[in-house]
Amino acid sequence: MKQYIVDAFTDKLFKGNQAAVCVMEKWISDDLMQNIAIENNFSETAFTVKNSDGCYDLRWLAPGGEIDFCGHATLGSSFVLFSFYEKKSSTIVFHTRQKGDFIAKRNEKGITMSFPAFSLKPVPVTDLMTKAFGAKPKEAFFDRDLLCVFDSVDLIKNMSPNEKDLKELGGTCIGVTAKGDDGFDCVSRVFAPQLNIYEDPVTGSTHCMIAPYWSSVLGKRNIKAFQASKREGVLLCEVNGENVSITGNAVLFSSCELNVAID
């Protein structure tokens, strides 16, 4: 089985978010996919199988189990398929189990993916949030993920949340965000203790919540987002009603043949 390791949401190696992408002729067992994801120990490993011209089935597994949606591993999968399998194509359609179809298009800015926007359901700011982050959020919202809004970029960048407290907050991922500086509309970080990931370096899926929030606050559709992890990354987001288009770049770190027995 061919596997590629890609740095997503960056144009530089060793930045962005790492994803392993396994391109398969047919599906393997769930147990084997989970073991591969654990062995890779990236935030996500993507598995994809072609089902027709320009159309691929796509699944994502974290070390802690399968997830319903992953942005950076979708970008990584798009990059691999455009680079090695669909060289003449400009569009790929991904069929997913729980989120329907995603469309990826390559263009002069990179690869643009269209995703469903998360809802912004306000929730009370709790003492546990303040304890977990070491500062009190001014607002909080919940959908699949928890999003907490703060006033300070420096606070976002320097925050060291308590992992145990984060787990108690719930949410597949936990995003923290503030109004941006240095040409960015927002600066954010994302934590995912429920998936056995303390901090996710660059998170496309959570920006389906972050981008609509800042679009509403700033009164603009196009949001240039910076994720301030150690690896850092840039996401160009466009909010269109119930959808968010996210554009990013990716670079290939390695490719290999996995030495696993496939039935």
Name every feature range the model reports, one short phrase each.
Residues 1-70, 75-263:
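Active-site proximal loop and beta-alpha junction motif in alpha/beta enzyme cores
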